[in-house]
Amino acid sequence: MTLQQQIIKALGAKPQINAEEEIRRSVDFLKSYLQTYPFIKSLVLGISGGQDSTLAGKLCQMAINELRQETRNESLQFIAVRLPYGVQADEQDCQDAIAFIQPDRVLTVNIKGAVLASEQALREAGIELSDFVRGNEKARERMKAQYSIAGMTSGVVVGTDHAAEAITGFFTKYGDGGTDINPLYRLNKRQGKQLLTALGCPEHLYKKAPTADLEDDRPSLPDEVALGVTYDNIDDYLEGKNLPEQVARTIENWYLKTEHKRRPPINVFDDFWKK
């Protein structure tokens, strides 16, 4: 088995999908989890205005709507959380995503004060954060807020990780990578677009250039610039297609060097890091 085949198998990626079937699969997956653990009353998700959180949010609200109707349990809710750092440049996209999702509840937590306070505390201890590390601080502060909300609403935190993100490890460890349940896992980027198209999502929410937008020095830096490959390249790779050698090597290098992000903390029984 080639490395490409191993990666595709590990991430559960498929070369083709039926959008309606995958929507149903994700919604049923969320419903089944909630029914298995009846003490869970809410799904909590940060909404950025980008493709992934818009899709995950819509699926969450669909699952909650169906489950409320089927069980008559009115205590179930989906909580969409806005998590700007100061003023978000694409705030209108966030509002458009909220309008599309129609969440039960919307909360806004501005993380800037918490990030600056943490940075100042570290500075006083003699640690000056780089812009890159400050970006990770933002991602972790966002997850901290979501877990606090989930803790107070008997909820779980929903993630937006999918195959095209997992393959490169393009998420912050214990930040946006630290969630309870991932309904998009297995899909690549273009497949996520297929689901949003089937759901009637406004095109500008999934046709915009994806960006983590964590670095102050490089605001709205496109993911594809940071990665050195395009999402079309990544999707083609995950669909088993042949790519130019350098492109395939870049993707595989990202996968191998970020393996630790896709695993629990390393213990004495692990040996993947020696290979």
Curated annotation (Swiss-Prot):
One of its GO terms (biological process) is NAD biosynthetic process. Mg(2+) binds at residues 52, 165. ATP binds at residues 46-53, 160, 189, 211. Its EC number is 6.3.1.5. Deamido-NAD(+) binds at residues 140, 173, 180, 260-261. Disulfide bonds: none annotated. InterPro entries: NAD/GMP_synthase, NAD_synthase, NH(3)-dep_NAD(+)_synth, Rossmann-like_a/b/a_fold. It catalyses: deamido-NAD(+) + NH4(+) + ATP = AMP + diphosphate + NAD(+) + H(+). Pathway: Cofactor biosynthesis; NAD(+) biosynthesis; NAD(+) from deamido-NAD(+) (ammonia route): step 1/1. Catalyzes the ATP-dependent amidation of deamido-NAD to form NAD. Uses ammonia as a nitrogen source. This is NH(3)-dependent NAD(+) synthetase. It comes from Shigella flexneri. The lineage of its organism: Bacteria, Pseudomonadati, Pseudomonadota, Gammaproteobacteria, Enterobacterales. The gene is nadE.
